[in-house]
Amino acid sequence: MQVFTGTDKVKRGLAQMLKGGVIMDVTNAEQAEIAEEAGAVAVMALERVPADIRAQGGVARMADPKKIKEIMSAVSIPVMAKVRIGHFVEAQILEALGVDFIDESEVLTPADEKYHINKHLFKVPFVCGARDLGEALRRIAEGAAMIRTKGEAGTGNVVEAVRHMRQIMDEIRALALLPDEELVAKAKELGAPLELVIETKKLGRLPVVNFAAGGIATPADAALMMHLGADGVFVGSGIFKSKDPRKRARAIVLAVTYYDDPYVLAEISEDLGEPMPGIDVRKLSETELLQVRGW
């Protein structure tokens, strides 16, 4: 049977291959090599990690194509890159560069406050963030092949990632108990297509892989998110803003694999050096929150 590249089935299948793994933010080829050596299943190429974007402010855009190509040349694992919400030209550029996945990310400054990218128009699979089931299903309806919790990137504080993962999982469990007669009304409430609501109820999970992201800084954080139902984790600032990135990267990869073994977790959490300085999310103003970007 002939398989056509770029179909939803193929794109979702590519994302499935990353299940159970760790995807790490990197800003140069050296960091990408450290991530690959540590066992990352993919790297996210970007100009600045979320902690620096938060600290420095300004408009955060797609990374320089030269930097992305350098990272792609340095590693054999898949390379992802971020685009601004709604900026389909940035996405076209990344597809032309040959990246393996595109993240339409709230971490970058949104380019369009009305529309997200129509991801069905691209052959490359997309990753998108979500805080709840409705948001996740709307992104999947637009063509996303992978969902991740938004969390609150660049804080080193896992509380929002926990909140978003619990919210999505709780809504899926509630959906499973809903009579079929109420699904049309539920789809309208979620702002999502009925067929995706039906599929989610039938599967008892999202139709695509759902990774955890936003504030994961320690092996324990990564293991916690796996316990809550994540298919894998993204780690942004938590690795390369720590004292010993190489050791912490390896520990987080092992934590995702052995998340259900506290003895292994205790061993790998030992002597990692200082983690990244964290931010109390409660002290952030509404304008400082990244998770509220998108709809």
UniProtKB/Swiss-Prot annotation:
GO terms for molecular function: pyridoxal 5'-phosphate synthase (glutamine hydrolysing) activity. It catalyses: aldehydo-D-ribose 5-phosphate + D-glyceraldehyde 3-phosphate + L-glutamine = pyridoxal 5'-phosphate + L-glutamate + phosphate + 3 H2O + H(+). Signal peptide: none annotated. D-glyceraldehyde 3-phosphate binds at residue 166. D-ribose 5-phosphate binds at residues 25, 154, 215, 236-237. Pfam families: SOR_SNZ. Catalyzes the formation of pyridoxal 5'-phosphate from ribose 5-phosphate (RBP), glyceraldehyde 3-phosphate (G3P) and ammonia. The ammonia is provided by the PdxT subunit. Can also use ribulose 5-phosphate and dihydroxyacetone phosphate as substrates, resulting from enzyme-catalyzed isomerization of RBP and G3P, respectively. In the presence of PdxT, forms a dodecamer of heterodimers. This is Pyridoxal 5'-phosphate synthase subunit PdxS.
